[in-house]
């Protein structure tokens, strides 16, 4: 008895057993690297796992695993920011960046911590916050082994080993390893400016008074003659 063609447009080759295809939207499958994987999202994940990046940028030769990622990257070279905020007019390369920016205007905080209920505008901020509860410190210093919950804290710490001081005071040229230390330092200059201004004003007033007295004395002497 001859069997009819299976539903869903599936074609099989029992002799080879290599290719399995399902033309329905949810089901295209192929056998690769000794395993059967979903052709859409699973294959893209497998490509990333194997570091396969077939899509290359002609401008900088940077490679990507997905064509959509390459398309977004190319906007950096063209300078085209096609996603514009209707509230302030600021433009962005990617729609996801515009969505994040819009939360500045709306105040929306869609990411909620299950432990304490605090909300955040970005998922990355929530992930960093959750490490307060879990105690996770995934960033380790290669020099001393000290661990940190945020990569920015590790970068700041590493400057204690390298001696790097990238933040320079525009007033006196003094350098600092952290931006917070520079901000504290600039307050010293801000406090000095009013004192200098008051000092200059006092000297100017004293000089004017002395000049006035001297002039008055000369006029009096001339009158006596």
UniProtKB/Swiss-Prot annotation:
What SMART domains has UniProt attached to this entry?
ZnF_C2H2
| Positions of post-translational N6-acetyllysine modification | 18
Compositional bias ranges of the Basic residues kind: 195-206
List localization entries: Nucleus
Where it mainly occurs, coarsely classed, is nucleus
Tell me which family the UniProt entry assigns to this protein.
Answer: Belongs to the krueppel C2H2-type zinc-finger protein family.
Q: Provide the function of this protein.
A: Binds DNA through the consensus sequence 5'-CAATG-3'. May be involved in transcriptional regulation and may play a role in tooth formation.
State the name under which the record lists this protein: Zinc finger protein 22
Name the source organism. Bos taurus (Bovine)
Q: Gene encoding this polypeptide?
A: ZNF22
